[in-house]
């Protein structure tokens, strides 16, 4: 690895670390205090919530995952807070995997594709019922928006780096509005997962988002 390559890799890592992540529902201390059983219950609830959550009471959820009501109330004071906890942990796990999918030596444009493909796993199993429940619940909608904003910010940081290195845009044309592009390409997964869109497309939200990311970025690549 040359010095120039090392500096480029360091710059990519630095920019990613400079983007502030959304505040977690469970803080780090509380997360580390979770027992193995509590983690198992939260993971099981994630599967239950794939098919929606507004119809469930805490008693219903305890019955579905085979635990006591006390176990659930030890995790969260209410059904709504429990839903937020489960969704937030899922999105954070996917977000970490998306960052880990990046090689510091990747060119920025390749990094954008890899990052968004991994991040779009968040909508891979979205069902119409879950999409409707999330859209109709202000707290979960705000949580999803916070994670989407982070996705946009990371994508913009990578786009800025791609522009600086001459990977995007026509050298003789107008400058690329990286903020606008980031909102579009990073928001595709969430858009295709909306209730009004999820039943209208022939593929999954993740597949549709990945395909359109490739189309858009190819159109913006700098010509040889």
Walk through the language-model features, giving the residues of each.
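Short, basic, alpha-helical segments at the C-terminal edge of helix-turn-helix-like DNA-binding modules
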Residues: 87-95
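Helix-turn-helix
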Residues: 40, 44, 51-81, 85
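N-terminal intrinsically disordered/low-complexity leader segments
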Residues: 1-39, 224
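Short amphipathic alpha-helical elements of helix-turn-helix/winged-helix folds
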Residues: 44-48, 118, 122, 188
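Short helix-capping/turn signature of helix-turn-helix
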Residues: 51, 76, 132-140
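Hydrophobic alpha-helical connector segments
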Residues: 85, 98-125, 181-182
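Hydrophobic/aromatic-rich alpha-helical bundle segments in the mid-to-C-terminal region
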Residues: 3-5, 130-134, 141, 145, ...
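A short, Lys/Arg-enriched amphipathic alpha-helix from helix-turn-helix/homeodomain DNA-binding modules
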Residues: 35-46, 99
């Amino acid at each position: 690895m040359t010095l120039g390559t090392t500096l480029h890799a360091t710059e990519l890592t630095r920019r990613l670390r400079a983007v502030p992540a959304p505040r977690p529902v469970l803080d780090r201390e509380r997360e580390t205090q979770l027992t193995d059983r509590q983690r198992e219950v939260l993971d099981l609830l994630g599967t239950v919530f794939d098919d929606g959550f507004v119809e469930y009471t805490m008693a219903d959820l305890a019955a579905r995952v085979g635990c006591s009501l006390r176990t659930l109330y030890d995790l969260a004071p209410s059904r709504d807070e429990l839903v937020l906890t489960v969704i937030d942990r899922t999105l954070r796990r996917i977000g970490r995997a998306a960052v880990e999918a990046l090689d510091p030596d990747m060119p920025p444009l390749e990094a954008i594709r890899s990052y968004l493909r991994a991040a779009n796993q968040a909508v891979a199993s979205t069902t119409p019922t879950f999409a409707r429940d999330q859209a109709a619940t202000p707290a979960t909608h705000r949580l999803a928006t916070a994670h989407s904003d982070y996705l946009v910010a990371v994508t913009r940081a990578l786009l800025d780096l791609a522009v600086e290195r001459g990977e995007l845009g026509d050298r003789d044309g107008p400058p690329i509005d990286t903020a606008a592009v980031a909102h579009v390409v990073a928001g595709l997964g969430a858009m295709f997962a909306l209730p009004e869109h999820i039943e209208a497309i022939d593929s999954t939200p993740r597949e549709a988002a990945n395909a359109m990311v490739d189309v858009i970025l190819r159109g913006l690549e700098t010509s040889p």
